[in-house]
Amino acid sequence: MAISSKEQETKKVKISVDKNPVDTSFEKWAQPGHFSRTLAKGPRTTTWIWNLHADAHDFDSQTSSLEEVSRKIFSAHFGQLSVIFLWLSGMYFHGARFSNYVAWLSNPTGIKPSAQVVWPIVGQEILNGDVGGGFQGVQVTSGWFQLWRASGITTEFQLYCTAIGGLAMAALMLFAGWFHYHKAAPKLEWFQNVESMMNHHLAGLLGLGCLGWTGHQIHLSLPINKLLDSGVSPQEIPLPHEFLINRELMAQLYPSFSKGLVPFFTLNWAEYSDFLTFKGGLNPVTGGLWLSDTAHHHLALAVLFLAAGHMYRTNWGIGHSMKEILEAHKGPFTGNGHEGLYEILTTSWHAQLAINLAMMGSLSIIVAHHMYAMPPYPYIATDYPTQLSLFTHHMWIGGFCIVGAGAHASIFMVRDYNPAENYNNLRSSSRHRDAIVSHLNWVCIFLGFHSFGLYIHNDTMRALGRSQDMFSDTAIQLQPIFAQWVQSIHTLAPGNTAPNALATASYAFGGDIVSVGNKVAMMPISLGTADFLVHHIHAFTIHVTVLILVKGFLFSRNSRLIPDKANLGFRFPCDGPGRGGTCQVSGWDHVFLGLFWMYNSLSVAIFHFSWKMQSDVWGSVSPSGNVSHITGGNFAQSAITINGWLRDFLWAQASQVIQSYGSALSAYGLIFLAAHFVWAFSLMFLFSGRGYWQELIESIVWAHNKIKVAPAIQPRALSITQGRAVGVAHYLLGGIGTTWAFFLARIISVG
């Protein structure tokens, strides 16, 4: 195939910057609202403070220059990284200064992790519970101790050094953010050079990042963990640098080290299989993945990403062009296919962000599930409070990211989308949006009525004493046969479809019970009718969330009801009376509604996880091998009715948080109570009439005028949108706080 001269042309990569584009001025920054002419004039009404918060980070509203917006985002990313390094440094510092890490390291099954000792001011020292080893403190459930163990950290001094390193990196990032905005700001074409960006992120960030971590794991983590696993005390283990410079020391633990790099260059790579393993399953000593497996995994990823980082065409005429790849995509029903997509993704950061948030959100939810099915760090599997916390945390993060994807998709549609440039291509999926939305709606109605209907049927039959007519494992069975089939093929894989694996990828699928310190780390998770029922509730709530978000961005520019919606903007309360309902139709309102359904989805998912694990996985193992689970396997019979969920999960397991007063867990009792109040407070904003408050304010202002203490800034009721924002924020904050206290008080007591 002949290549035209146009295709051979490559965009020469130039580092192009503007020198000193923006002055560094503390005087300017000290003025509230300096980024907006209107806000800089100062407050006339109380609405000013709301607009200040709403617009401070809305760079689109501050300038129409894409280059300037790009620079602000780029600079803000360095600020974000600085905060992350500061937070990391704080975590490591707490580990070094206030924790019982070294004691935990010598007895990880008998001592609980703690890195916070509460000062006695008026009796708060009650919160310092006995975590074992003579240490009194607040039990932490973050998983840091297990991560440090996997990294090969054995002393507080190492934690101190890392904390100082984190501070140095935070300062460097802060400087970089200032430098690349005020001293040398990249030009727009630098931000739009996607091939270079892909190559650098794939090869540098992911490829070299994985390679660096592999090196750390092989040279430091593996030998130190091998010695710890075999019972050597942390004090007797050689210092980390000795493993780096003393090959004999390494060769005692991993004989292939004595051969150096000869096997690598002679392609006898199998020689290295003593530290790059493919075992599968879990380390029976720690209940975590084999660290030699994870080193091998990261090495493989490094190779993949380093190769991927050489795929895109830059200064040399070889490799892919992103625009050509996209425009080659043409399906039978999508007209010009992906034509125009390259222009969208290089000129709309909202479109980019929407895709990235959806991907990262989904990835976070995948991480949540892998953390318990394949526990990656030593002793994390038997630390039930940490397992529950990490699952819940990653589910929440994922949910917020996915709703954020819907938000930025709508903002893209309203602010950045140009219909003239997107005729007859894939982006005109808005042409068949009615089919998409009505099908989703039908799916939601079907799933909702059928999944809920199965529970209602069971509740009714149980109330009538007709247990033989219920859907259950002992009466009318609804077994999840496809899930059970997936479990069985994974269990049978080692030696068959995965010929080199010694054990299954996860014992959740089947196989042995792995116990550490007489506690279950992981075991086969049997699925039955109760799981089948609740999985259809998951399907229902997830599809409703998707319906709201997808309808939101597909109709964010126009609809039959409001054809000129794009002119009204991303958020507006209503579009006047007289045409049916024109309130709650903006892109923003769909995000608002989507957040509630995201909360519904995740609550059911984390409740399902918490109860299922306590009922069917977590528990103690007797010397004879009998397992007694925390709630004695009650999930299969109790979780098949609404009443069972209310009585045997919510009510039965809330006893610990409700009765926590006067114990080390009493803070959770207070948080449980306070978070309920925060949640109830949200309802005042969600069921509110704006006019009611404005009338009330007028009366209060009249009274102030009467006694001549009227404020200079005129009080205003919250706008409808502001009220909804305050409402949903407190609803979610209250809900998350309540769940946090409920879960932790329970699992710290019984786990």
Swiss-Prot record:
Enzyme Commission no = 1.97.1.12
Q: Which residues bind [4Fe-4S] cluster?
A: C574, C583
Per UniProt, phylloquinone binds at: W693
Query: Mind telling me which residue stretches traverse the membrane in this protein?
Result: 73-96, 159-182, 198-222, 294-312, 349-372, 388-414, 435-457, 532-550, 590-611, 665-687, 725-745
Keyword annotations from UniProtKB, A to Z: 4Fe-4S, Chlorophyll, Chloroplast, Chromophore, Electron transport, Iron, Iron-sulfur, Magnesium, Membrane, Metal-binding, Oxidoreductase, Photosynthesis, Photosystem I, Plastid, Thylakoid, Transmembrane, Transmembrane helix, Transport
Q: How is the cofactor bound?
A: P700 is a chlorophyll a/chlorophyll a' dimer, A0 is one or more chlorophyll a, A1 is one or both phylloquinones and FX is a shared 4Fe-4S iron-sulfur center.
Residues the entry annotates as binding chlorophyll a': H676
State any GO BP term from the record. Answer: photosynthesis
Is-annotated flag, keyword Metal-binding? yes
Which InterPro entries does the UniProt entry name for this protein? PSI_PsaA (IPR006243), PSI_PsaA/B (IPR001280), PSI_PsaA/B_CS (IPR020586), PSI_PsaA/B_sf (IPR036408)
- Kindly give the Pfam families that the UniProt entry links to this protein: PsaA_PsaB
Binding site residues for chlorophyll a: M684, Y692
- Quote the catalytic activity from the record: reduced [plastocyanin] + hnu + oxidized [2Fe-2S]-[ferredoxin] = oxidized [plastocyanin] + reduced [2Fe-2S]-[ferredoxin]
- State the membrane topology: Multi-pass membrane protein
Quote the subcellular location field of this record: Plastid, Chloroplast thylakoid membrane
Q: Give me the Gene Ontology terms describing cellular component.
A: chloroplast thylakoid membrane; photosystem I
Protein family: Belongs to the PsaA/PsaB family.
The record's note on quaternary structure and interaction partners says: The PsaA/B heterodimer binds the P700 chlorophyll special pair and subsequent electron acceptors. PSI consists of a core antenna complex that captures photons, and an electron transfer chain that converts photonic excitation into a charge separation. The eukaryotic PSI reaction center is composed of at least 11 subunits.
- NCBIfam families linked to this entry: psaA
Q: What is the protein name stated in its UniProt record?
A: Photosystem I P700 chlorophyll a apoprotein A1
| Gene name in the database record | psaA
